[in-house]
Amino acid sequence: MTYKTSLRKEKIQERDSISTKERDLAEKNTAEHFMNTYTELDFEKVSIYSPIKNEVPTETITRYIKELGKKCFLPLIDKNLNNKEMKFSEFTNEASLVKNKFNIPESLNSPLVIASELELVIMPLVAFDNKGYRLGMGQGYYDFTFKNFQLNKKQVFLGLAYDFQKTESCYPEEHDLKMDAVICPSGIYKFS
């Protein structure tokens, strides 16, 4: 078992063990940090995620973004699982969501945008380190979709995490995406 596989397993088990109360408190605190940091959201198109498996909830942040008149988009995974490049569909309401093969809610009948059109990308993660690297679920969708755009720095990559998801190193590889910041219940980590 590789270090990444072992770390992923450990952090997922830890995340799975948190209570509903802990998860709700994490959402409240994370959302407060987000709203205090992004008081005037300069981004028109924001990618958000639908949380699964006890990922940090995004409902409050999504509502805030929409109240500011901005558009939220959800990742859309291609039915051909060999195609790792995600597209993004506009999120209008919960009723429009359909679960994909990974049990992730997607908005299927909404306008699509490609990754380069997004200005703020809010991502789930399994772990993150001091340098801003993230460890995801292991499929590489975010890495593959955004790696080429990261070089132009027109997009901001933001992770949402629990404090226990911070680790010394995610042992990044060349293809791994680096985030600009991570928001946790206790505060914000910014990376240069």
Task: Please provide the spans of the model-predicted regions.
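Short linear sequence motifs
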Residues: 42, 134-135
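Surface-exposed, charge/polar-rich loops and edge strands
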Residues: 2, 13-16, 67, 111, ...
